Curated annotation (Swiss-Prot):
GO biological process, alphabetically ordered: mismatch repair
SMART domains: MUTSac, MUTSd
Family: Belongs to the DNA mismatch repair MutS family.
Pfam families the record matches: MutS_I (PF01624), MutS_II (PF05188), MutS_III (PF05192), MutS_IV (PF05190), MutS_V (PF00488)
Lineage of the species this protein comes from: Bacteria, Pseudomonadati, Thermodesulfobacteriota, Desulfobacteria, Desulfobacterales
Protein's name according to its UniProt entry: DNA mismatch repair protein MutS
Keywords: ATP-binding, DNA damage, DNA repair, DNA-binding, Nucleotide-binding
Key word ATP-binding present: yes
Keyword Acetylation: no
Function: This protein is involved in the repair of mismatches in DNA. It is possible that it carries out the mismatch recognition step. This protein has a weak ATPase activity.
InterPro entries: DNA_mismatch_repair_MutS, DNA_mismatch_repair_MutS-lik_N, DNA_mismatch_repair_MutS/MSH, DNA_mismatch_repair_MutS_C, DNA_mismatch_repair_MutS_clamp, DNA_mismatch_repair_MutS_core, DNA_mismatch_repair_MutS_N, DNA_mismatch_repair_MutS_sf
Residue numbers spanned by region Disordered: 824-849
Length: 895
């Protein structure tokens, strides 16, 4: 939309808008942020506010809408949630003193990945901006949470010039809110599948020059004031460095100020953590319930009793990034064990942590210049708790609880306590949120401010005192101090005494009965009185900035303490959860044995109502019990058993105690899951396609130290196709690289139980069921051996299927079991008649089949069939044989 005739204000607006074309421009006008033209048309329906216009009487009036500046955050949040970006344009001078149009500038751009306001953020989740690129044969991923200062990067080998699946999974694992991609990716068919994988993330395309390696390195070195990136372990990093440089460029463009709170760039490797891809995270319900997408019903809902926001974020990271280092895991378990064994100290620490605010986000806001007086007060309260926290921690010995990452803990504690004292001496407890209203600085801190405050509070009495002093000094009984809007404050003396005024009095006005004068001293007093509020606000802001700068200088120490307290918080939370839920410390082994005695599903056991949770034992190893085929009816609990094994392994490697009587566990490097049945119809993917994609991912990437959880693969296609696929996958995982992989395979294909006799490391188990009077009771107990019954009709009855349907199902089942080819109808006479017809049809069919073979030499085929021992064949072997015979028949029929 264009404007035919531009006013000076609209010229300014359009000039600024031109620099930020992909944003909604919040243009400050007095007490409102206004939006014009296309921005107004986009924003009004999202914000649910009235759309109006400027110059309504003219042709083509300009669409506009506005929101109060005090409520801007609420409206900005709505725009961000709808996928829009917001450029905040402020008035840079007082409109009262401006000559011409008020000077305005964009002070920051808010995007989904660039949010500092805690009201717009999930307190216990990071808010990552990520960047992905390909450079010199490598694929790199970097991410930054500007609200906490976290900045990380990694890279891996590109596959045929493309981003590998492992890096796509990593971008999903960090749950980025915004992803930067090179502009050249947009519209390029090569990257269409990659972009499709990130449909839940807002993608921002930026110029390819932002990803250039050389400029990225220079940008990072300048940012961290270093000569090289060697100290960050990034000197040999190509794509990872390019991605990090692109993020830094984007941050500088949107925030328009330095990010001093981003103190380091951390390089990490994907293979140093237990990998759980995004699908497995969903299937295991680590962070969200798969049905409701809520936190309730997930693993984190059970484990998260952290006190602080930063502790909550770290716990989430521990769940998504379990360790594979035995030493690292044991260090966490040692800390949890000690905290669990000392409930008095643990409870005292947790009580003190209730007064600790989000130090990471407070530090970031202060460093970025977005903090208000109440943020400083929150920091003060938090820092005052350090001595009490350290006093309790000194009674414990676990290395994780001693803050060894802080070089001199006592010195840092003392420095930060002194910083808290400074805040206490300067910032009022009842200070307002706004920085321009005064009322921020404590009385007694600044003599100059105290004088201004005295004048502001008692201006009239101060003027009266000045008048009394002048009257006494001059001896003029008629002397008075008065005020009007023309002259301000002035001295008035009667006509008779006007000849006796001191020489330094300056005549200002002559009246019939009096003369009016001013003095330099009076004008100075007047200036102080009339400008007291403005001077007060200005001085208080300057003093506030000085205190803020003192805090910024201590930002590294604040962040170290924040990270340490977050770790303490997580340890205390895991200890509390372990005690409340009767968890036990897992033992770790190097023997590739996964042995769980009386294991429980941590979430399901909390949700069971009206019945006792039945624990189950599982043992997996690489010698005899590597692949377990688990059969049993629906609703019996197969899926729960499968998931609990994966969750117990994950919990142990994140450093948590586990829900089991005993757990002796090997280190798992990756967990794969194929569980659940959520169709992705919106992408045109059926249940079967989703299953096959997940299965393909597993068979292509599983290794010796992985754990594979398979639940009902092969559905959504014909029975024999599904069974064949399930069988082949089970065999493949058993034979993988000649070593196999630990696998739990729940299935309704009872034919798979034959694998136990064919493969040395396959074992059969089933979920026990008790039958009585044509009903079943689920015992929920995993027992050795297979089963050949699915109890589908009984489960249907439990689900509330009408009796008429159940009765009919039994008839059909009996008929099928007796004669699979028989067609069952409503009428028994029809059944007999149909059966007779079927026999006749089969006889005719056999004759036709004999005629088909007539005239051709099929002796070879008949000989193969005669010599084949069907009882020793697997379904895969049988299908292969049938395929070969069909090819031979076709070739002979064409002769």
């Amino acid at each position: 939309m264009t404007v035919k005739k531009e006013t000076p204000m609209m010229e300014q607006y359009l000039s600024i808008k031109k620099r930020y074309p992909d944003t909604i421009l919040f243009y400050r006008m007095g007490d409102f942020y206004e939006m014009f033209l296309d921005d107004a048309l986009k924003a009004a329906p999202v914000l649910e506010i009235a759309l109006t216009s400027r110059n309504k009487t003219q042709e083509d009036p300009i669409p506009m809408c506005g929101v109060p500046h005090r409520a801007a955050d609420v409206y900005i949040a709505k725009l961000i949630e709808s996928g829009l970006k917001v450029a905040v344009c402020e008035q840079m001078e007082d409109p009262r003193s401006a000559q011409g149009i008020v000077k305005r500038e964009v002070v920051r751009v808010i995007t989904p990945g660039m949010i500092l306001n805690e009201d717009l953020l999930d307190k216990k989740s990071n808010n990552f901006l990520a960047a992905l690129c390909i450079c010199q044969g490598a694929a790199g991923l970097a991410c930054m949470d500007i609200s906490t200062g976290m900045f990380r990067t990694t890279q891996t080998v590109a596959v045929n010039g493309k981003v590998p699946l492992s890096l796509v999974d990593e971008a999903l694992r960090i749950d980025a809110k915004e992803l930067l991609l090179p502009a050249s990716f947009k519209g390029d068919p090569t990257y269409s599948q990659l972009i499709k994988a990130f449909e839940t993330i807002q993608i921002s395309y930026v110029g390819n020059e932002n990803f250039k390696l050389d400029s990225a390195r220079e940008r990072l070195k300048e940012k961290f004031r270093t000569r090289s990136l060697e100290g960050f372990g990034c000197e040999d990093l190509t794509a990872g460095t390019a991605a990090a440089g692109a993020i830094l460029s984007y941050v500088q463009e949107t925030q328009l100020r330095e990010t001093d709170h981003v103190l380091t760039l951390e390089r990490y490797e994907l293979n140093t953590y237990l990998i759980i891809d995004d699908r497995s995270c969903r299937n295991l319900e680590l962070l969200k319930n798969i049905q409701t997408s809520d936190k309730k019903g997930s693993l984190i809902s059970v484990l998260d009793c952290t006190i602080t926001a930063m502790g909550g974020r770290l716990l989430k990271a521990w769940i998504r990034y379990p360790l594979i280092s035995m030493d690292g895991i044991e260090a966490r378990l040692d800390a949890v064990a000690e905290a669990k064994e000392n409930p008095g100290i643990r409870n005292s620490l947790r009580t003190h942590l209730k007064d600790v605010y989000d130090l990471e986000r407070l530090g970031s806001k202060i460093s970025m210049g977005h903090a208000n007086p109440r943020d400083l007060t929150a920091l003060k309260i938090s820092l005052y708790k350090l001595p009490l926290l350290f006093k309790d921690l000194n009674q414990l010995s676990a290395s994780l609880l001693q803050g060894h990452g802080i070089e001199d803990r006592e010195k840092v504690s003392t420095e930060l306590f002194e910083l808290a004292d400074l805040i206490n001496q300067t910032i009022r407890e009842d200070a307002p949120l706004a920085l321009n209203e005064g009322g921020i600085i404590c009385d007694g801190y600044s003599p100059e401010l105290d004088e201004i405050l005295e004048i502001a509070r008692n201006g009239r009495s101060w003027i009266a005192k000045t008048g009394a002093k002048e009257k006494e000094k001059t001896g003029l009984s008629s002397l008075k101090i008065k005020f009007n809007k023309v002259f301000g404050y002035f001295i008035e003396v009667s006509k008779i005494q006007s000849q006796q005024v001191p020489d330094h009095y300056i005549r200002k006005q002559t009246l019939v009965n009096a003369e009016r004068f001013i003095t330099d001293e009076l004008k100075e007093v007047e200036s102080k009185v009339l400008n007291a509020q403005e001077r007060r606000s200005s001085l208080e802001y300057a003093l506030f900035c000085k205190v803020r700068e003192s805090i910024v200088q201590r930002t590294p120490s604040i962040f170290k303490i924040a990270q340490f307290l977050a770790e303490v918080d997580v340890v205390l939370a895991l200890a509390t959860t372990a005690e409340e839920n009767n968890y036990t410390r897992p033992a770790l082994n190097k023997d590739q044995v996964l042995d769980i005695e009386d294991g429980r599903h941590p979430v399901v056991e909390k949700m069971v109502v009206g019945e006792r949770y039945i624990p189950n034992s599982i043992r997996l190893d690489n010698t005899s019990d590597q692949v377990q085929i688990i059969t049993g009816p629906n609703m019996a609990g197969k899926s729960t058993v499968l998931r609990q094994v994966a969750l117990i392994s994950l919990m142990a490697q994140m450093g948590s105690f586990v829900p089991a009587a005993r757990a002796d566990l090997c280190i798992i490097d990756r967990i794969f899951t194929r569980v659940g049945a959520l169709d992705n119809l919106s992408l045109g993917q059926s249940t079967f396609m989703v299953e096959m994609e997940e299965t393909a991912n597993i068979v292509n990437n599983a290794k010796e130290n992985s754990l594979v959880i398979l639940d009902e693969i092969g559905r959504g296609t014909s029975t024999f196709d599904g069974m064949s696929i399930a069988w082949a996958v089970a065999e493949y995982l058993h034979d993988l690289d000649g070593k196999g992989v630990k696998t739990l395979f729940a299935t309704h294909y009872h034919e798979l139980t034959r694998l136990e006799k064919l493969k040395p490391r396959v074992k059969n188990f089933n979920i026990a069921v008790k039958e009585f009077n044509d009903n079943i009771i689920f015992l929920r107990r995993l027992v050795p051996g297979g089963t050949n019954k699915s109890y589908g009709i009984q489960v249907a009855r439990l689900a509330g299927v009408p009796d008429a349907v159940i009765t009919k199902a039994k008839q059909i089942l009996a008929s099928i079991e007796q004669s699979p080819d028989q067609v069952v109808t409503q009428d028994k006479k029809q059944v007999k008649k149909q059966t007779k017809n079927n026999h006749s049809a089969r006889s005719g069919s056999r004759q036709q089949q004999m005629d088909l073979f007539a005239g051709h030499d099929y002796d070879e085929i008949i000989k193969v069939l005669d010599q084949t021992d069907i009882s020793t064949m697997t379904p895969i072997d049988a299908l292969n044989l049938i395929h070969e015979l069909k090819q031979k028949i076709r070739s002979k029929a064409m002769i």
